[in-house]
C-alpha cells in the first residue's frame, strides 16, 4: 500500500522545518500561510522551490510546512532541506540529482558563540598600548 503523504525534516542554522508532501496541484503552505504571504523576499521563495524545479516535480505535490526558529534565510534553507528529504521518500532514484546539486547534505554552519572577555565571537575590545 502506497503512503498518502511523504514526510521530511529539514534543518538550517537554528531553524527546523517539518515538511509533508501530498499528491496535488502545487500549493505550498508554510505555518498556515501561503508561500507568498510567509516570505516577503523573492530569494527565499526561490530557495524553497529549488528542489522541486530541479527534479521537475513543480505542481505535482501539495506541500504543508511547519517551521520554527531562526530568521528568513535559515527557515528557507530548512524548508528546502525538508522538501529534499521528502522527495527522496517519494522516489529514491532522485538521490543522485539532488546530491549533485548539494541539497541532500545538511549545512552544518551555525552561529559561533560569544566568548567572555571579548565583544563578540572573535571581535575584541579596542586595545590601547599606552
UniProtKB/Swiss-Prot annotation:
- List the record's Gene Ontology CC terms alphabetically: cytosolic small ribosomal subunit
What molecular function terms (GO) are annotated for this protein? RNA binding; structural constituent of ribosome
Tagged with keyword Ribonucleoprotein: yes
Task: Supply the alphabetized keyword list.
Answer: Ribonucleoprotein, Ribosomal protein
Zinc listed as a keyword: no
> Which Pfam families does the record cross-reference, listed alphabetically?
Ribosomal_S9
Sorted alphabetically, which NCBIfam families does this protein's record hold?
A: PRK00132.1
Q: What is the protein name stated in its UniProt record?
A: Small ribosomal subunit protein uS9
Q: By its UniProt entry, which PROSITE patterns does this protein fall under?
A: RIBOSOMAL_S9
Gene name as annotated: rpsI
List this protein's GO terms for biological process.
Answer: translation
Disulfide bridge map: none
Annotated family: Belongs to the universal ribosomal protein uS9 family.
Q: SUPFAM superfamilies from the entry?
A: Ribosomal protein S5 domain 2-like
Check the record and name the InterPro entries matching this protein: Ribosomal_Su5_D2-typ_SF, Ribosomal_uS9, Ribosomal_uS9_bac/plastid, Ribosomal_uS9_CS, Ribsml_uS5_D2-typ_fold_subgr
